[in-house]
Swiss-Prot record:
GO terms (BP aspect): translation
Keywords attached to this entry: Ribonucleoprotein, Ribosomal protein, RNA-binding, rRNA-binding
Any one GO CC term of the record: cytosolic large ribosomal subunit
NCBIfam families: PRK08571.1 (NF006344), uL14_arch (TIGR03673)
Claim: Magnesium is one of the keywords in the record: no
Alphabetized GO MF terms: large ribosomal subunit rRNA binding; structural constituent of ribosome
Primary role: Forms part of two intersubunit bridges in the 70S ribosome. Binds to 23S rRNA.
Protein name (database record): Large ribosomal subunit protein uL14
Pfam families, alphabetized: Ribosomal_L14
Length: 132
């Protein structure tokens, strides 16, 4: 996985409810764990923009509900700082469901995704309509 070019402050923690930004049938996701997170004892795992997370589908089609899947965070409300000094934040927290090869399971992505996510996950960027 490629390093991010921005200083990403983690805006999501374990148990956060986020929207699903693709057309897989899931509408709302709950963060269960964060891949590669090694924290201190009794500290909640935190995820930020471009992190791979394990989620549970809380709202969506009956086939998708209650499934445990992998996802990538594509938008977060907490501002991130880019190397040129600009800060970027989005209106909502959103993720895209991916398979084991980190390809998106949906065919289209709703809303914009961050440039940092596009650099790290090229297949997610190819399905995106707008990159900010």
């Amino acid at each position: 996985m490629e390093a991010l070019g921005a200083d990403v402050t983690q805006g999501l923690e374990k148990g956060s409810l986020i929207t699903c930004a693709d057309n897989t049938g899931a509408r709302e996701l709950k963060v269960i764990s964060v891949h590669g997170y090694s924290g201190t004892k009794n500290r909640h795992p935190k995820a930020g923009l471009g992190d791979k997370i394990t989620v549970s589908v809380t709202k969506g089609t009956p086939e998708m509900r209650r499934q445990v899947l992998e996802a990538v965070v594509v938008r977060q409300r907490k501002p991130i700082r880019r190397p040129d000094g600009t800060r970027v934040k989005f209106e909502d927290n959103a993720a895209v469901i991916v398979d084991e090869n980190e390809d998106p399971r949906g065919t289209e992505l709703k809303g914009p995704i961050a440039r940092e996510v596009a650099q790290r996950f090229g297949s997610v960027a190819s399905a995106a309509t707008m990159i900010v």
